[in-house]
A protein has these predicted regions:
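Membrane-embedded alpha-helical bundles that constitute the cytochrome b-like, heme-associated redox core
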Residues: 1-122
Length: 122
């Protein structure tokens, strides 16, 4: 289950990277909404799967990575909250601040990196 979660969140990271490239190349124009919606749905699905996978047996105790799963779900969950804030900002027809995108991406990539260590080392 944890490997499947890692793959799902990896797809969300790739979609998010594509959205970031599109945002930067079009000088802040709105990203295509179907792609943004797919990114959000895949990410939320991955977050849900990660929360379910963490209910299983403890892993990574010998390597010292036992808490990495909790850290990953916290970082990715925070990124998801900012993503929902981005959606609300878009629906209110306001310009999305660049710092919001940067914080969202930093939390998401950080959570994914911690998850990678948890899956591959733990």
């Amino acid at each position: 289950m944890l490997t499947t979660t890692f793959v799902i969140l990896g797809i969300a990271v790739l979609l998010g990277s594509l959205l970031a490239v599109l945002y930067l190349r079009t000088e802040g124009a709105a990203a295509p909404w179907p792609l943004a919606a797919l990114h959000g749905l895949v990410a939320i699905g991955g977050l849900f799967c990660l929360a379910l996978a963490l209910r299983g047996p403890l892993r990574g105790v010998e390597q010292g990575t036992a808490s990495f799963g909790i850290i990953a779900v916290t970082l990715i969950g925070s990124a998801a909250l900012i993503g929902v804030g981005s959606l609300v900002t878009h629906l209110l027809k306001r310009r999305l601040p660049g710092i919001l995108i940067g914080v969202h991406a930093t939390l998401a990539v950080g959570g994914f990196a911690i998850l990678a260590a948890y899956v591959l080392v733990g």
